[in-house]
Amino acid sequence: MSLRRRILPLWRGELSSDAAISLGLTRYWFQRIKLRLIGNFNIMSKVALFPGSFDPFTSGHLNILTRALTIFDEVVVAVGINQAKRGFYTMSQREDIIAQATKDLKGVKVISYDGLTVDLCKELGIKHIVRGVRNMTDFDNEQAVADANRHLAPDIDTIIIPTAQEYSHISSSAVRDLLSHHGDLSRFIPDWVVLPEII
């Protein structure tokens, strides 16, 4: 069953907490996610923005993107430019890594941007932002950002997707640390992705 068909009853209030648990959600997650997502979400809106620094793009990011594509026809992966911070990989390298990771996915576009994410959404006419969370600390942080974005742009909603358990240990910072120490990346990066050499 697609993610869309599984989560629509959750948004509509038709799915009990016991049923949600059978789909892999804890009771606490069920309540938090239901409150976060119910908003003004319109499932008929077919395009979403998936923003991040993606330095680099990981198997966890790919998991979130793949699941988002079961909800939306198109997801724009937006690589954020932080002028005050030197990235581990250049912008073009990050875009290339994402292109490799998503080569078999339909409906994915990759762009880079600077400035506010909600301003990019307005520019592109996108009404939904997709974010992935690995734990409740991530969730609380994303909820705070989502609430701030709603003040700036009330018509733009954030869709928070919990990372599948097998990817919950993965982060870009962990990948960077492994790269710096020549560690094993097989559980962190899709095996068909070739990362650029670090000079």
Features from the language model and the residues they span:
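A cross-taxon signal for low-complexity, glycine/charged-rich
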Residues: 3-6, 10-15, 19-20, 24-31
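Hydrophobic alpha-helical elements and their junctions with loops/disorder across both membrane
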Residues: 16, 26-27, 33, 55, ...
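Short, Lys/Arg-enriched N-terminal segments with co-localized hydrophobic residues
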Residues: 29-43
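Nucleotidyltransferase catalytic core that binds NTPs
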Residues: 40-199
